[in-house]
């Protein structure tokens, strides 16, 4: 089973911030068990939604240079609300610091404008071929996958404006 925690990218400013949404549906299988009479998105999956949004930001910031962008640390994570079916978790992540292999970000998730989760994340980025050159083709595939995923989830404002019908005077 594969989970998706970014349904759409609302805003993307490479090197600065990203805003994404996750629309929680009763179709999410884990809701049957978490919790049976009070279905809510598990906290660890809210953290994963922040991680996924942050990884898209890092990938776009560096023009998809790295095939692997993984969570290294989650600091000061606070859960402040529930995400129930029919609600939308809006995640915003901002880059605080870019270092050699690590990127530090501040991330938060809200539901209807109210805080649900926030924390600081450290993501580590690298290529598999850095340690195993034979995996260079896998790196290329994964980088292309990131690009394709972002192309499906985000349309820059200038593209949307170009598609808008022109009004004649």
Predicted regions and their residues:
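Catalytic strand-loop segment that frames the active site of acyl-thioester-processing enzymes
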Residues: 1-41, 159-169
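Short, hydrophobic/aromatic-enriched beta-strand segments in well-ordered soluble domains
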Residues: 22, 92-95
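Hydrophobic beta-strand-centered segment that forms part of the acyl-chain substrate-binding groove
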Residues: 53-90, 118, 124-126
């Amino acid at each position: 089973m594969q989970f998706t925690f970014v349904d759409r990218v609302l805003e993307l400013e490479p090197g600065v911030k990203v805003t994404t949404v996750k629309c929680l549906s009763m179709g999410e299988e884990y809701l049957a068990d978490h919790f049976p009479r009070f279905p809510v998105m598990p906290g660890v999956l809210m953290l994963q939604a922040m991680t996924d949004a942050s990884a898209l930001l890092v990938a776009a910031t560096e023009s998809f240079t790295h095939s692997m962008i993984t969570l290294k640390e989650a600091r000061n994570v606070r859960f402040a609300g529930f995400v129930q079916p029919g609600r939308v978790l809006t995640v915003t992540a901002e880059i605080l610091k870019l270092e050699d292999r690590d990127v530090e970000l501040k991330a938060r998730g809200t539901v209807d404008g109210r805080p649900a989760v926030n924390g600081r994340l450290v993501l580590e980025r690298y290529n598999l071929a850095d340690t195993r050159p034979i995996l260079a083709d896998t790196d290329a595939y994964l980088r292309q996958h990131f690009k394709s995923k972002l192309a499906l989830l985000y349309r820059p404002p200038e593209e949307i404006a170009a598609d808008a019908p022109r009004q004649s005077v």
